[in-house]
């Protein structure tokens, strides 16, 4: 079993093209089902999830292929998961 802290320590990598998205900064949880729906990773150019562009990667849980000791492997198209931050 993993905790949020554990996920934040893992780098997210796309198996399609080897892109390194960064580290998990947040989760979207479906409260009705009690399941994680989406992993959120700060977009390109962001430092510590704070400074930089106002974009983020929103990776649906269904796109996660493997959670390893140090990394999270995902299989998705970058242009479909890189979105404007709505905060």
Regions found by a protein language model. Give the residues of each.
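Peripheral interaction segments used for macromolecular assembly
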Residues: 1-87
